Amino acid sequence: MLYNLSKAVLALSVLAASADAAGIRLEKRASTFDYETEMVRGVCLGGWLVLEPWLSPGLFDAAPDGAVDEWTYTEILGQDEAKARLIGHWDTFITEQDFFDIAAAGMNHVRIPIGYWAVEALPGDPYVDGQLEYLDRAIEWAGAAGLKVIVDLHGAPGSQNGFDNSGRKGAIQWGQGDTLGQTVNAFRKLAERYVPSSDVVTAIEAVNEPFIPGGVNEDQLKEYYQQAYDIVTQMSPDVDLVFSDGFINPTPWNGFISDSGNIVMDNHHYEVFDINLLRMSVDDHVRSVCDFGRTQLAPATKPVVVGEWTGAMTDCARYLNGRGVGARYDGAMGGESVGDCGPFIQGSVSDLSPDDQKNMRRFIEAQLDAWEMKSGWLFWNWKTEQGAPGWDMKDLLDNGVFPFPLESRKYPGQCG
């Protein structure tokens, strides 16, 4: 198919580019990306340098049941054993070839999550380090492939959302004690490493998914964002701060900090984590995302990138809701059952019925059209270890469910 042909053509340049990349060491900044005028089209490299059980279930299946996030994984296994296993994961889950495949698909960005503990773990933390060397390498590979990088502080001290993807599942304790100052310190060190020196890193994200509806104090969050903005703008006029809307949507942030440059809002849009959304038909999903583009993205006074979204319309992917936790869709979490999870749990999108594949393609196309009403998008995620239909962009591209070229449409004009 066209995507695989494009990969093959681009692969001819990999050896030469690899040789060039080997000599790159984050030198003086030269180029930028204009988030005000250019369209972001990219993908996240989740589950690599910050663990998530559903993206790399094999790591967790080989660990005791109490390992449900990176904190407990390293705590239970011990640092020596955990680091040995994680090095094996870091070496293989994402490689240089992935960056060339992403570029071959027509994308211009990757967003790379990293935890605060990779920069500087706190006393008493069980985490292991070593991730920054891989992030350095990833930035070199991205540059060789012609991609821009958003460095994403995905986990903050105390957990900013209580999700396993923050490093520690459970209560939100970000904002308590010294956690805000500790986050500023981690962010500053991350910025010092990449903002002044890499022409590949065009933006850095203050913190991933601070959960305002879950209890994060909005005033404290705004104070932190201001400090992060000052750190970045003092280091370089060519790098933007990315900040999450905190799950309160983009338009309430109009006028915050600056509407005139060096700042980008990150909105995450999923329609799978609520039973009412799971009940919706594909027509409903299409209308929903198109309406969101018109009412929340287009009127925003800053650039807004939908920095996480999916082709899935169920929450059936194994461990998506947490290790050992079932899905809402089939009633395993309690309450009504919308349908059978079946082939949506694990494996390839090619295992789905033709109708399910068509509906997923239609939903993906509608989202692409909606998100490009503003500043673009970053799909979650590039790959999964054991397959998660609808979430694995590489699998979606390989099976023609994600458009290639990105502008191609089987269902044009869905957003009017």
Swiss-Prot record:
One of its GO terms (molecular function) is glucan exo-1,3-beta-glucosidase activity. Transmembrane segments: none annotated. It comes from the Eukaryota. The active site is at E209 (proton donor), E308 (nucleophile). Keywords: Carbohydrate metabolism, Cell wall biogenesis/degradation, Disulfide bond, Glycosidase, Hydrolase, Manganese, Metal-binding, Polysaccharide degradation, Secreted, Signal. Disulfide bonds join C290-C415, C316-C341. Its main location: secreted. Its cofactor is Mn(2+). GO terms for cellular component: cell surface; extracellular region. Residues 1-21 form the signal peptide. PANTHER family: GLUCAN 1,3-BETA-GLUCOSIDASE I_II-RELATED (PTHR31297:SF1), GLUCAN ENDO-1,6-BETA-GLUCOSIDASE B (PTHR31297). Belongs to the glycosyl hydrolase 5 (cellulase A) family. Beta-glucanases participate in the metabolism of beta-glucan, the main structural component of the cell wall. It could also function biosynthetically as a transglycosylase. This is Probable glucan 1,3-beta-glucosidase A. The gene is exgA.
